């Protein structure tokens, strides 16, 4: 009898071990709302990491939740399948011009980790990186940006998030009914979720760095100055944009929301009726209505985006960004050498330069987004002529003056607002602010996405190129030559050292001088060159035209 019991016991133990070992091939994590099962991926150089995709961090913003601030995620029964990404939020497909993609149920995030807590015998928690995607607040999704370069040799937990876009994310009635900024409040909800749950993935909630490029950079800067986001992160990386860029704060959002209500056959005089009616309309139709505010070639950048909230119990943006005090944490800010090149390339497609020459006064206010800033038509047209004379003299817009067009867009849309943000944060904070200009141009660029023939290695890096050397961008070029791989290591090192210590590239700390706290001092920054060298530089300005302030 004893032998029989022993045999049965061993058999049960074997079966139990077999089931446990088999189950262990599927990584599982317990978060506050339930259990999730993920999968595996491999980094650029073949390191195996865990991935948990499409995790809901808030309730679906559908039906009565449409236009509401994000609502708490509801617990689920069973095991959540986190091996496939969640849907992108409704927006315009990049490069398509007008195609609407995504779903309204879209508030998901993705978590990547090199090791889970049970594998970490020392019990040390890892630094956390949260990436907020760009896309003008009307396109993009978190899954497009992966940590496959960052996690090659670094033990970080990486999170990417989705948030509501366009009208569904940023409509406002200008009062307490629909206060606006729901897309940014989604991001806050994601940051709160991370505070509650990231330990389950081995992450340290007290060491969170938020990053973003373009509208993602604007988002990061907005979190840096929003009282709603205080205490949710410890460092910030801002790439190619800021809350001070003209496109970052949308104008006349309440008026635009009423216009959409009228377009959808809804009342326009009562905010409650506007919102109730719009909740009954097809989500894709509302998302597509965004295009009514981009009259030429998807300009202006952001008809709907962050807006100052005039009412509400808790405001994300209680005042204009320039009047808000930033949280006192280390900040790393950057800009590409030729931010405007991607836009001048896009504008030159399909006879665009001729259209621009023939309709300069009409198109320029939309390209540079001062169509609302300067309401007087005569003054608006005069400003257009002043700008043309400043950048082009008496020359027409053409392939020969494309660099002039790039410079104009760089100055107005990125250079002024980004450098101003760096100076503002540095002047207010005790923590250091670092600024660098990315000057390396490799085998691939965003420019090649629109016009491959116009791009060649060493041309000039443009908007978004820098990010592709830190985060693997889904569907884009994979760098496979020695120089580009070297730049990946360089950029990853800059980020990694900043994430760990609040100081970038600690081996060359004498070159990384913080931005001066005195606004009267020359602007200090580090230049990353085509030869992959670092140069400490100072300028009285960052190259932005002096009269640019007048129409900012």
From Swiss-Prot:
CDD domains: Esterase_lipase. It catalyses: a carboxylic ester + H2O = an alcohol + a carboxylate + H(+). Disulfide bonds join 89-106, 266-277. The active site is at residues 214, 339, 463. Glycans are attached at residues 81, 269, 371, 404, 443. Keywords: Disulfide bond, Glycoprotein, Hydrolase, Serine esterase, Signal. Residues 1-23 form the signal peptide. Its EC number is 3.1.1.1. InterPro entries: AB_hydrolase_fold (IPR029058), CarbesteraseB (IPR002018), Carboxylesterase_B_AS (IPR019826), Carboxylesterase_B_CS (IPR019819), Type-B_Carboxylest/Lipase (IPR050309). One of its GO terms (molecular function) is carboxylesterase activity. This esterase confers insecticide resistance. Belongs to the type-B carboxylesterase/lipase family. Overproduction of nonspecific esterases is a common mechanism of resistance to organophosphate insecticides. This is Esterase E4.
């Amino acid at each position: 009898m004893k032998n029989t019991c022993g045999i049965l016991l061993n058999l049960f133990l074997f079966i139990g071990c077999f089931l446990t070992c088999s189950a262990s091939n599927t990584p599982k994590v317990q978060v506050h709302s339930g259990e999730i099962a993920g999968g595996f991926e491999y980094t650029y150089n073949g390191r195996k990491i865990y991935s948990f995709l499409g995790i809901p961090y808030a309730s679906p913003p559908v039906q009565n939740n449409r236009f509401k601030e994000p609502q708490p995620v509801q617990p689920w029964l069973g095991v959540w399948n986190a091996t496939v990404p969640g849907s992108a939020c409704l927006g315009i497909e990049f490069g398509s011009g007008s195609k609407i993609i995504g779903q309204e149920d879209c508030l998901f995030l993705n978590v990547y980790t090199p090791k889970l807590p049970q594998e970490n015998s020392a019990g040390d928690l890892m630094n956390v990186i949260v990436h907020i995607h760009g896309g003008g607040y009307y396109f993009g999704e978190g899954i497009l940006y992966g940590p496959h370069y960052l996690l090659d040799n670094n033990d970080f937990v990486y999170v990417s998030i989705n948030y509501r876009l366009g009208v569904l994310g940023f409509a406002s009635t200008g009062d307490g009914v629909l206060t606006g900024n729901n897309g940014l409040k989604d991001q806050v909800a994601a940051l709160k979720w991370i505070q509650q749950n990231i330990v389950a993935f081995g992450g340290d909630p007290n060491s969170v760095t938020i990053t973003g490029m373009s509208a993602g950079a604007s988002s990061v800067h907005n979190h840096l100055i929003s009282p709603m986001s205080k205490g949710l992160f410890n460092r910030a990386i801002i790439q190619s944009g800021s809350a001070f860029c003209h496109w970052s704060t949308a104008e006349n959002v309440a008026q635009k929301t009423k216009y959409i209500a009228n377009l959808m056959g809804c009342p326009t005089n009562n905010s409650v009726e506007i919102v109730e009616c719009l909740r009954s309309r097809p989500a894709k139709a509302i998302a597509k209505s965004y295009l009514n505010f981009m009259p030429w070639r998807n300009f202006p950048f952001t008809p709907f985006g962050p807006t100052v909230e005039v009412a509400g119990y808790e405001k994300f943006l209680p005042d204009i960004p320039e009047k808000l005090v930033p949280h006192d944490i280390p900040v790393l800010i950057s800009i590409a050498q030729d931010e405007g090149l991607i836009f001048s390339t896009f504008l030159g497609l399909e006879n665009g330069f001729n259209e621009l020459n023939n309709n300069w006064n009409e198109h320029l206010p939309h390209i540079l987004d001062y169509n609302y800033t300067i309401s007087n038509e005569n003054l608006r047209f005069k400003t257009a002529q002043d700008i043309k004379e400043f950048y082009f003299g008496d020359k027409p817009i053409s392939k020969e003056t494309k660099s002039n067009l790039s410079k104009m867009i760089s100055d107005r849309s990125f250079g002024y607002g980004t450098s101003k943000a760096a100076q503002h944060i540095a002047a207010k904070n005790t923590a250091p602010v670092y600024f660098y200009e990315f000057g390396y141009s490799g085998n691939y660029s965003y420019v090649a996405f629109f016009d491959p023939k116009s791009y060649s290695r060493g041309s000039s890096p443009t908007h978004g190129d820098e990010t592709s050397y830190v985060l693997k961008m889904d569907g884009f070029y994979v760098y496979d030559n020695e120089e580009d791989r070297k730049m990946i290591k360089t950029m990853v090192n800059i980020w990694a050292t900043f994430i760990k210590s609040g100081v970038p590239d600690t081996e060359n700390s004498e070159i990384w001088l913080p931005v001066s706290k005195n606004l009267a001092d020359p602007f200090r920054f580090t230049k990353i060159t085509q030869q992959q060298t670092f140069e400490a530089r100072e300028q009285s300005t960052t190259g932005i035209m002096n009269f640019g302030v007048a129409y900012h």
